[in-house]
Amino acid sequence: MDESKKNERLQQLTDIQYNVTQKAGTERPFQNEFYDNEAKGIYVDIVSGKPLFSSNDQYDAGCGWPSFTKPIDEAEVIEHRDLTHGMIRTEVKSADADSHLGHVFPDGPQDKGGLRYCINSAALRFIPVDKLEEEGYQAYKKIFE
């Protein structure tokens, strides 16, 4: 992502969006926008706009954050070992904007690969299926057909 465009986008973020994506912050569980979203659509990186997750892969993990079994395209997320807070975890960042998204854990549904991508709502923008074309994401409509 072009640095000037990234800086422009960063200036448009709310405090919580900036804290989560740029300072690896975490939202409060059950008090965020998408933890219980049941609408069909895709979730894009709040900074770069790159598609990251689909509602088709979202499930209720009971953790209080949006949870997904997989990204739309694995190339759009980067995983790093995270040793903060006295834990060993795997951090998930967006490949294009290097935004902190959340963490991935090996306790997801076994029949869908066994992973749980636990992602902060503040790192995401939701595009409903009926707005995909209008927002420039028409290529992703096929996911829902």
Curated annotation (Swiss-Prot):
Organism whose genome encodes this protein: Listeria monocytogenes serotype 4b (strain CLIP80459)
Keyword Cell membrane: no
Reactions this protein catalyses: L-methionyl-[protein] + [thioredoxin]-disulfide + H2O = L-methionyl-(R)-S-oxide-[protein] + [thioredoxin]-dithiol
Pfam families: SelR
GO BP of this protein: protein repair; response to oxidative stress
Molecular functions (GO terms): peptide-methionine (R)-S-oxide reductase activity
Active-site positions on this chain: 118
Annotated GO CC locations: cytoplasm
Family label: Belongs to the MsrB Met sulfoxide reductase family.
Gene3D superfamilies: Peptide methionine sulfoxide reductase
Gene: msrB
Protein name (record): Peptide methionine sulfoxide reductase MsrB
Keyword Oxidoreductase annotated: yes
UniProt entry keywords in alphabetical sequence: Oxidoreductase
Enzyme Commission designation: 1.8.4.12
MsrB domain span: 6-129
